[in-house]
Amino acid sequence: MQNPGYKVTTSPLAHLTAGLKPVSTTTGVTLQDASLQARVGFRGRQAAGWLELHGYQVPVRANQATWQTDGSLVVRLSASEFMVLADSAASQQSVQQLEAGWQLSDIACYLLPRQDTHAWLRLRGPDIAAMMAKLCAVDLSAAAFPAGAVAQTSVARANSIVINAAKPGESAEFWLLIDSSLAAWFWEACGDAMTEFAGQYLPQ
């Protein structure tokens, strides 16, 4: 059985981000809704091999993330569970194709649609670790939480996946994935926390 794929067209934060305007300069922390970007999950004892068969480089250990040549990010959540997230136009298409191309077969790799289940927020700026310290008990400083690290933890009392998605030579960047039903509340909690760090909201 082939999966028809799914493309999300509305963010759970659309009512909060609709009026946002681009900003000319950003010196502090920025918060952006990335929920319209493609993302998909896979689970099973052969999920790593299935992803490698489709050209993806898989992190060796759990709670690690690896950038791909198409601009997507593969996140390993456990020995047998992965998430693939798009961060470019090319990877948006490839991640959607990856989801649509999955078929139920004898291979122990099972599709976990993530467009509806998880909202996706981006935090950028030099002070994001200090800002997150107000919301999360885990040490997310650069020394303890380097680029490519993943934490499955509580942020603002909500179960969250935190990914250090920083690239070499670019500003610090965290991706936060949380239950879509909590997206609006979580957005406001992050907004309150970034106030003292010259926080700004960015449009999608």
What are the residue ranges of the model-derived segments?
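Basic, glycine/lysine-rich polyanion-binding surfaces/domains
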Residues: 1-204
